[in-house]
Amino acid sequence: MDEYHQLIIDTLKNGNFKENRTGVSTISQFNYNYEVDLQEGFPLLTTKKMDGSRWESMVHELLWYLSGEHHIRNLQENTSIWDAWADEDGNLETAYGRFWRRYPVPKQRNQIEGESWVTEEDYREDISGDFYFIDQIQYVIDNIKENPNSRRHVVTAWHPANAAISKLPPCHLMFIFNVQNGKLNCHLTQRSADIAVGVPFNIASYALLTHLVAKEVDMPVGTFGHSLVDAHIYCGQDERAEWYKENINRLGEVAWGNISVLKDDIEEQAPGNNEDNMDHIPNLLEQLLRLPKERPTIEIADKPIDDIQFEDIQLKDYQHEDSLRFGVAE
């Protein structure tokens, strides 16, 4: 996908060396934006293998989000991608689906005079009776059907009181549906974007979500827009990271098409052997040397969104290059 390749190039060309909480250094840039036309096929990257277990994990994760579960006990039956952030009982400090489907609403006694809040017709009470919540997914679906031209089809996973202390607050924190010329578009805001590991998943996941919602509201899909606040590429630790800090201007050569030369120089000159693949730059350069193939398509069963199961979503005509390995910074 050309848009993804350009993201890599622009980050290497314009990015800054930046430390972060993980201890693995990054090349980072601020406020990167791009669009993908969903009418041109499903945006699953073709310059590396993303079917098999990767596709399965992405679909199971999205369906888990839509379930509204705050734990990973059911998700663990199909993928382990959230295991590192859960406690021994499978509970998460922050779960996207919990806020998508059960965003807390203050009880009336806690509301300030003059404020406007949803009424009992719009919210639900938790089975424990301890709190009220609004189902944001159902709200936007109903709102798109009733008032498609509204600019308020917003879903957020960010709760400040949770995010302030969470081990991993939401990275892709808010998305907005917008209807133009009868087509359903989706815009995602992402505060932190791991270009090698996370972004390919995020593109596919929100494209699939857009298809699911579009089917629910009986509209064709339009465009996926993506805003990356901190778009970054991990470049290793210790001496290897220091080498990138001292040679960051060399990375700009990628914009001039000197990809093979730059890749060879890094492999020869950067300290360490990168056995843990925490330096993502060499394999991203390898990916840039590959030509994108025609995008695949998807088929979705004719079911309500809350009844969709994994087997109801089929990936079709997917051509791809070989796998590339990238370490995950936790």
Label for each model-derived stretch:
Residues 1-330:
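Terminal, non-catalytic protein-protein interaction segments that mediate quaternary/complex assembly
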